């Protein structure tokens, strides 16, 4: 005779083991090929929401190795390098930055800061990253020159803890322009001329159930910008599901990811 309660308990235990002990470590690489003739041949790696906990140095080195293996033209980091909640312990940025400094790309390594970074000490985190060769952008842009033609990269301030200024970030920037931001909630304010906006913050909800999707997405727009590559009003947004966790160290049906963008 089938004992339904026992089976349900076993399934629940297996789900907890998977969500807390296994899936958060199953790093995947998501590749997006985007048609943008002005950027054809450009390869970018985007990684966000590291949330490095104490003792996770080995995991961070694994992530850095996976990013480096892509041999991208440019590396973009979407913020939340640390854990910023009061009840969460975080690896200090002074230990994180030297590992991230092992990342190199012909067109540079750039970053924006996230809400957790600012909860800890955004000024200090930005300063440490800068000293380790990672340029932090906040409401500003850089012209990037390459053999296939120049483009611009604009970085926005976090919309939860700071004041993003899209006009200032794009001031004097030509086309094509890429935009990086921690949270996708600013996306409706990004003009159509942006070739692509890259964001993180949502973690894809961390827990996504079959047929129901993510249970909770930290966005004023709910599941609208949960993850992936949504198109909206002629604009493109790529939302990474992130690398780490927040609130609870759990992921279910939402593996941590490194995002690769190949323009055609």
Question: What are these regions, as identified by a protein language model?
Answer:
Residues 1-40:
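N-terminal membrane-anchoring alpha-helices
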Residues 26-56, 169-175:
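Mobile, glycine- and charge-enriched loop segments
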Residues 51, 81-82, 116-117, 141-142, ...:
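Catalytic metal-binding/acid-base residues of hydrolase active sites
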Residues 30-37, 140-147, 228-232:
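Short acidic-hydrophobic surface loop/beta-edge motif
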Residues 126-134, 138-140, 146-181, 185-192, ...:
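Binuclear metal-dependent hydrolase catalytic cores centered on His/Asp/Glu-rich metal-binding motifs
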Residues 41-137, 143:
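Membrane-embedded segments
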Residues 184-262:
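Conserved beta-sheet core of the metallophosphoesterase superfamily
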């Amino acid at each position: 005779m089938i004992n339904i309660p026992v089976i349900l308990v076993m399934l629940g235990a297996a789900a907890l083991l998977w969500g807390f002990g296994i899936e958060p470590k199953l790093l995947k690489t998501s590749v997006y090929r985007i048609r943008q003739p002005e950027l054809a041949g450009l390869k970018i790696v985007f990684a966000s929401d590291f949330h490095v906990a104490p003792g996770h140095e080995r995991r961070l080195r694994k992530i850095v190795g996976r990013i480096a293996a892509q041999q991208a033209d440019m590396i973009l980091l979407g913020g939340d390098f640390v854990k910023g909640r009061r009840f969460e312990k975080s690896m200090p940025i002074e230990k994180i930055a030297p590992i991230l400094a092992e990342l190199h790309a012909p067109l540079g390594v750039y970053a924006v800061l996230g809400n957790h970074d600012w909860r800890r000490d955004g000024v200090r985190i930005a300063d440490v990253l800068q000293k380790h060769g990672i340029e932090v952008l906040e409401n500003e842009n850089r012209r990037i020159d390459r053999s296939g033609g120049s483009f611009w990269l604009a970085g926005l301030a976090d919309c939860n803890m700071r004041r993003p200024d899209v006009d200032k970030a794009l001031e004097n920037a030509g086309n094509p322009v890429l935009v990086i931001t921690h949270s996708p909630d600013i996306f409706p304010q990004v003009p159509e001329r942006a070739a692509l906006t890259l964001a993180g913050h949502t973690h894809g909800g961390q827990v996504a159930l079959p047929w129901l999707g993510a249970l909770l997405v930290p966005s004023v727009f709910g599941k609208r910008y949960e993850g992936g590559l949504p198109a909206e009003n002629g604009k493109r947004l790529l939302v990474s599901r992130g690398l780490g966790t927040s609130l609870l160290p759990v992921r279910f049906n939402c593996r941590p990811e490194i995002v690769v963008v190949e323009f055609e």
